Regions:
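Short helix-initiation/N-cap motifs at beta->coil->alpha
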Residues: 58-59, 73-84, 165-179, 211-213
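Periplasmic-binding protein-like
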Residues: 38, 115-119, 189, 193-235, ...
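Extracytoplasmic small-molecule ligand-binding "clamshell" domains
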Residues: 20-97, 105
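Short loop->beta-strand "edge-of-pocket" segments that line small-molecule binding or catalytic clefts
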Residues: 30-36, 54, 133-148
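Alpha-to-beta junction loops
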Residues: 32-33, 69-71, 87-96, 140-142, ...
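Flexible hinge/capping segments at coil-to-helix
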Residues: 23, 124-141
Length: 255
């Protein structure tokens, strides 16, 4: 009962702060529109058989909608256009994305709730050849990236000598490695740990993680009322143990 009263208090407080906020519209429409790619295991995955979403971020968004007292609607998005979806008002919020200066130019970010490192993936049979980050930085090496991801930008920084090959979703960079069309790719340590289990022919380069990065939800830039509400909600959920429970559920460990 106390939780319900507290949630109502938060909603009324922030909604009254700015009647033109996304928060006010979400409450008025009774629906939270969430942009998500559905291709990032275990954060957001779309089951092609049922067209339903599941994952860490999906559970987070369902909980947010529940506390707001509204329905949740997942809007399909692609990495190359996920930022544009926020600016074009196709959705009210996104599932987690990496906070980058480029994205922050046009979109707002909530407080962060997950931190990860970046690692390279190669074929296990090539692990002796590509045992370090530096071994992949070679003019004879092809590094695959997925168009629009933060890893696409990181690859340019980490591998200036290598050939970079961008693929467009629904294709994924690691699939190029599996098919032998690329020597490696980089991804979050979170996804990499899942991929090497799902595809035992892949291996993580054992040279350590680089570039610690933070995940957050994207919201419309300049909408402080909506951003403040969601950020306050995230912090409250951290304190309540909600995120800790989800980390255990999905066998994750934030840095």
């Amino acid at each position: 009962m106390l939780r319900v009263i507290y949630t109502i208090f938060l909603v009324l407080f922030f909604a009254n702060a700015n009647a033109n906020s996304t928060l006010d519209r979400v409450l008025k429409d009774g629906e939270l529109r969430v942009g998500t790619t559905g291709d990032w295991d275990p954060m957001s995955m779309k089951d092609p058989a049922t067209n339903k979403y599941k994952g860490f971020d999906i559970d987070v968004m369902r909980e947010l909608a529940k506390d707001l007292g509204v329905k949740v609607k997942f809007v399909p998005a692609e990495w190359k256009t996920i930022v544009a979806g926020i600016t074009a008002d196709r959705y009210d919020i996104s599932t987690s994305v990496t906070k980058t200066p480029k994205r922050a130019e046009v979109a707002g970010f909530t407080t962060t709730y997950y931190k990860y490192g970046t690692v390279p993936l190669v074929l296990k049979k090539n692990l002796k050849k590509f045992a370090t980050w530096n071994s992949l930085n070679n003019k004879d090496v092809t590094i695959a990236t997925t168009l629009g991801t933060s890893q696409e930008e990181k690859a340019k920084e980490f591998f200036p000598k290598s050939r970079l090959k961008s693929v467009e979703a629904p294709a994924r960079d690691f699939q190029e490695v599996l098919a032998g069309r690329a020597d490696g790719n980089i991804t979050s340590s979170t996804e990499a740990n899942k991929l090497v289990i799902k595809y035992p022919q892949l291996a993580i380069v054992p040279d350590g993680e680089k570039n610690p990065a933070f995940l957050a939800m994207m919201v419309p830039k300049g909408d402080k009322t909506w951003n403040n509400y969601v950020s306050k909600w995230i912090n409250d959920k951290k304190n309540s143990g909600f995120f800790k429970t989800l980390l255990t559920k999905y066998n994750l460990k934030s840095l």
